[in-house]
Amino acid sequence: MAGAYAARCTQGRAFRSGLEDKVSKQLESKGIKFDYELWRIPYVIPESDHLYTPDFLLPNGIFIETKGLWDSDDRKKHLLIREQHPELDIRLVFSSSRSKLYKGSPTSYGEWCEKHGILFADKLIPVAGVKEPKKEVPFDKFKTKKGVKKNG
């Protein structure tokens, strides 16, 4: 999430949102190591190549993306990534999953996720997700983001 938020730094980088900061504090308080915006996952928007940088990678191979505002382009991007990388477990943490897709929409972020089989939560990562068994992540398909160091 873009913005001017820069409350604190980790791994030499400032968080870009208050929600990212809150989730990082949750992980730290539980003694869970994480990589912050380290991995760049390639995906293709038809006729053009793009890179997606998820916010967090947990030790068990689950990627976490935090979202306040979740616009149409973000939703399209997540569908493309899921189609092109079905082996990845990418979950969303919303400021509020009850927010509507757009003004006047009958559909909330959470309802949209349920329709598309995307796991999500509000405010913080559910502890059960952090304790799930390790999943294999095909790191050989990805590039690391320049200037960001791996944790641990």
Curated annotation (Swiss-Prot):
Gene Ontology molecular-function annotations: deoxyribonuclease IV (phage-T4-induced) activity
Keywords of this entry: Endonuclease, Hydrolase, Nuclease
Pfam family, one: Phage_endo_I
Keyword Cytoplasm: no
InterPro entries, sorted: Phage_T7_Gp3_endoDNaseI, Restrct_endonuc-II-like
Enzyme Commission number(s) of this protein: 3.1.21.2
Entry annotated with the keyword Hydrolase: yes
GO BP term (any one): viral process
Catalytic activity: Endonucleolytic cleavage to 5'-phosphooligonucleotide end-products
Cited function: Endodeoxyribonuclease I, which is expressed in the late stage, is necessary for T3 genetic recombination and the breakdown of host DNA. In the early stage of infection, T3 DNA replicates as a linear monomer. In the late stage, the T3 DNA replicates via linear concatemers several genomes in length. The gene 3 product has also been implicated in the maturation of these concatemers.
Protein name in UniProt: Endodeoxyribonuclease 1
Organism: Enterobacteria phage T3 (Bacteriophage T3)
